[in-house]
Amino acid sequence: MTRPVVTRFAPSPTGFLHIGGGRTALFNWLYARKHGGKMLLRIEDTDRQRSTQPAIDAILDGLKWLGIEWDGDTVYQFARAARHREVAEQLLAEGKAYRCYATAEELTAMRDKARAEGRSKLYDGSWRDRDPSDAPADLNPTIRLRAPLTGETVIEDQVQGRVVWQNENLDDLVLLRGDGTPTYMLAVVVDDHDMDVTHIIRGDDHLINAARQKQIYDAMGWELPVMAHIPLIHGPDGSKLSKRHGALGVDAYRAMGYLPAALRNYLVRLGWSHGDQELFTTQEMIDAFDLSAIGRSAARFDFAKLESLNGHYIRQTDDQSLVTLLEDLLHYVPQGPAIAARLTDTTRAQLLQAMPGLKERAKTLLELLDNAGFIFADRPLAVDTKGQTVLTPETRALIGRLRAALEDVSPWTAANTEAAMRTFAEQTGLKLGAVAQPLRVALTGRTTSPGIFDVLAVLGREECLSRLADQAA
């Protein structure tokens, strides 16, 4: 009987949930869901100096926002230190590990010598078979794995293929430090085994760890999980991903106005493909996802492509949901509190009414919010630099005449205000654009906005006539 699929996402809480970590979590989640299994979450908080509660909170919040729900309780690695020590002691008792009393100075000398000779194996194994009676009384030993000296350690990786290491080049890795704390290598193996993890899907920067961890599995006689080391994410120029490329936390993408569904769709296509398909519903991702379709080459992050995809998702989202998403965004942007203070039943209704025009122009929720600024603006409007160039003495006089032409419009609708403006343009011999642009600046403070007649309808008669009066000569 085959074991049920269990994957895991195991971040270190030393910072935010990186975009690469978000993709790793997504791949683990998709694989587990496709096979009717579970994805577990383990917080690898053994680095007590760098692990922080705010980072843990950011990871949990980021996963939830992305729509990645893990199964069962969150496991905290540090809390399992006693179990990790128990395994190290078992290996010691079985002769598969040994106490190493090398001093810091001796270890430094070994490393320097190995590097000078071009050897990757840095520890010389001097305490591997040494008589324990030689041990200095004042030094707490580390516990090292008695790794094989000959032969090969082989990983049949689902992405990288067959990967082989010569054992003569691998150190006897430390399992327990001198102070009794377990190392990352030991803790990961013990936790994955105890959590019944069947598939380890992680970045290929962990590939060298796979060889060392397999040696622990072998020493314990445990079954090695299936491994899939996925390529890292690079910038558009092929260099290591940096902040200028998009190496930000998932929380930053939320604050920049990306929809979780759009970011999920973008991330799944970074390194994985399903024919030429670009757009996926969540269920389509689950149905199609397969480790064999992950490439070995580094994926390239393209902000323009993400923006375009996000714009598509915004246009496909219903108007009421976008209003809700905008309200949520206010918690994460500097101008949020000021706009939130202006949110009333009236402005919410105006936002909903304006949404069809707003969402056609926006690639992010932040752009959408910015374009909706005219709804929340105080009188008299702050007019931007481009708008100021439109407001000449002549156009201010024109605005006064426009206001008079609009006063008798009833009922106040986009169609009726448009008819009044077209009549005004014909009577004055002006092109509609020459009428619309001063009107736009007077009502929004900008030279760009949603359709001007939609703006008139959204703001309503009283507000429009008041704003026009503010700017009229």
UniProtKB/Swiss-Prot annotation:
Keyword Lyase: no
GO cellular component: cytosol
Localization annotation: Cytoplasm
Renumbered ranges of motif 'HIGH' region: 11-21
Catalytic activity: tRNA(Glu) + L-glutamate + ATP = L-glutamyl-tRNA(Glu) + AMP + diphosphate
Record-stated family: Belongs to the class-I aminoacyl-tRNA synthetase family. Glutamate--tRNA ligase type 1 subfamily.
Protein name in UniProt: Glutamate--tRNA ligase
Organism classification: Bacteria, Pseudomonadati, Pseudomonadota, Alphaproteobacteria, Hyphomicrobiales
